[in-house]
A protein has these predicted regions:
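Short proline/glycine-enriched turn/loop motifs at strand-loop junctions of beta-rich domains
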Residues: 34-39
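Hydrophobic faces of well-ordered beta-strands that scaffold small-molecule active sites
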Residues: 141-143, 198, 263-265
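Beta-strand signatures of extracellular beta-sandwich domains
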Residues: 41-43
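Conserved, mostly hydrophobic/aromatic
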Residues: 32, 87, 145, 200, ...
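Single conserved hydrophobic/aromatic residue that forms the stacking wall/gate
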Residues: 275-285
Length: 285
């Protein structure tokens, strides 16, 4: 019953920072906190969705429960870099397949998580990237923007391939309609105004946009999160590659910092895209 279920949650606690997939070339350890599950398996895939190549898993491993912490874990030997995975979680007689809520990378539409080495997603100069700070709070002029809205117009002066995407922020010298001497657009416009921070509307992975289709043919602000810790794929040049969306998101942040503009990430943990709490991989379309 609910009381027993909740009581078991209360007595299980884990303060570690290694939930998700911890990668090395020799092995990857998977950990997920699910104290009330009867069993958990991790399934490894070559691709991020059923629509790419062989849809079947290449391996599946049972995970072991630490009853003290409520953490299920398993270590798989070998190099799993950029392989995709899901968990099969059993509660009672029901088994659901789900992405990893702790994942930092995922495949198209967030249906499968991805094993990632974050150091390989760093753009050139990332080690020198720093937060933008102001001396006084009153100096913090903040503009709210959407990644898609920021450059989606044909008049933005941004190259067609980058319109509505992370990489639009990396283009310098953009003007209205690309006309030399015309008014500045995008990041150059923000610099001209003296904006110190941008609060970017959700750019975590959200469910209302089909990442396999052109972002210019769809629209949503993104307040329906699927994977809180993965960048949205529709804003990347290749949503099928989990590492690409991370690198290009970093490039956006780096470009803004280089322009003297700080970045505030709009995150809404009280919003969900789930149709039903027992269907973790299903989300509203």
């Amino acid at each position: 019953d609910y009381q027993a279920y909740a009581a078991n949650l209360d007595k299980s606690a884990y303060s570690g920072n290694d939930l998700g997939a911890s990668y090395s070339k020799k092995a990857t350890t998977f950990k997920v906190w699910s104290p009330n599950a009867a069993s958990v398996r991790v399934n490894i895939f070559e691709h991020g969705s059923d629509n790419e190549g062989d849809a079947g898993s290449i391996m599946s491993r049972a995970m072991s429960l630490d009853k003290t912490t409520g953490v299920w874990s398993v270590t798989i030997n070998g190099d799993l870099l950029n392989k995709y995975y899901t968990y099969s979680v059993t509660h009672g007689k029901t088994t659901k397949e789900t992405a990893d809520v702790y994942a930092k990378a995922c495949g198209v539409n967030g249906q499968r998580s991805m094993v990632v080495d974050l150091s390989t997603t760093n753009p050139d100069g990332w080690e020198n990237d720093k937060h933008v700070l102001v001396q006084n709070q009153t100096d913090a002029s903040v503009w709210e923007i959407s990644v898609a809205d920021f450059s989606s117009s044909e008049s933005s002066g941004v190259s067609e391939a980058n319109r509505g995407k992370y990489l639009a922020f990396t283009e310098e010298g953009t003007t209205v309609n690309g006309v030399q001497g015309a008014s500045s657009t995008c990041v150059d416009y923000l610099k001209k105004l003296g904006v110190k921070y941008v609060q970017i509307m959700p750019f975590y992975d959200f469910g209302s946009v089909d990442e396999s289709k052109n972002i210019m043919d769809q629209y949503n602000w993104g307040y329906d999160p699927v994977n809180y810790n993965c960048p949205e794929g529709s804003y990347s040049s290749n949503p099928k590659k989990g590492e690409v969306r991370i690198k290009e998101c970093k490039q956006m942040i780096q470009a803004l910092h280089n322009a003297g503009i700080g970045v505030i990430m709009d995150v809404v943990y009280n919003h969900l895209s789930l149709i039903h709490i027992s269907e973790p991989t299903r989300h509203a379309q």
